[in-house]
Amino acid sequence: MSRYRGPRFKKIRRLGALPGLTNKRPRTVRDLRNQSRSGKKSHYRIRLEEKQKLRFHYGLTERQLISYVRIARKAKGSTGEVLIQLLEMRLDNILFRLGMAYTIPAARQLVNHRHILVNGHIVDIPSYRCKPRDIITSKDKPKSGALIKNSIKAFPREELPNHLTLHPAPYKGLINQIIDTKWVGLKINELLVVEYYSRQT
């Protein structure tokens, strides 16, 4: 299944706020009520919707999400927590979290167009897995710097998660540690996502 490119507001009306996909939110309380008045949900539908939240928020294809679930299952610790950590440490998500891009799709475009450096080297793979002590900067070109600056000014982050630091112009992001999952800005039950895939195999 390919990455979703359709109407974004349609997804947040059904699934709730997805800050990685769009900075828009359901317009009214009625929109949110409509989500809960569609009848009693089956256990399957609840698990499916949690999976869809994760997929659309991080901008993943179905195949990519399955791959991350498999990696998380093989790692030590809670599969759900490891899954979230893997997704949060993607380069496109780190850029979004730092405020260098206003959504994850916008961050992916920055990376694909070779505007981003990790530890002084161009990285053009949005799924690149960042690690502690990595330094994220823009390429030393006026256009690259302007794109980052405009995003930070237009959509300033009120508070950064404690695993990230953003230094002012020239903007530089530093990864301090692996994310603590309490900082994930998405209302999600990751265990239901793991259950969803466990029942599919």
Swiss-Prot record:
Entry keyword set: Plastid, Ribonucleoprotein, Ribosomal protein, RNA-binding, rRNA-binding
Residue stretches making up the S4 RNA-binding domain: 89-149
Keyword Plastid listed: yes
Taxonomic superkingdom: Eukaryota
A molecular function (GO) term: rRNA binding
PROSITE patterns per record: RIBOSOMAL_S4, S4
GO biological process: ribosomal small subunit biogenesis; translation
Disulfide bridge partners, by residue number: none
GO cellular component, one term: small ribosomal subunit
Localization annotation: Plastid
Chief place where the protein resides: plastid
SMART domains xref list: Ribosomal_S4 (SM01390), S4 (SM00363)
Record NCBIfam families: PRK05327.1 (NF003717), rpsD_bact (TIGR01017)
Function of the protein: One of the primary rRNA binding proteins, it binds directly to 16S rRNA where it nucleates assembly of the body of the 30S subunit. With S5 and S12 plays an important role in translational accuracy.
Family membership noted in the UniProt record: Belongs to the universal ribosomal protein uS4 family.
UniProt subunit comment: Part of the 30S ribosomal subunit. Contacts protein S5. The interaction surface between S4 and S5 is involved in control of translational fidelity.
Protein name: Small ribosomal subunit protein uS4c
Gene: rps4
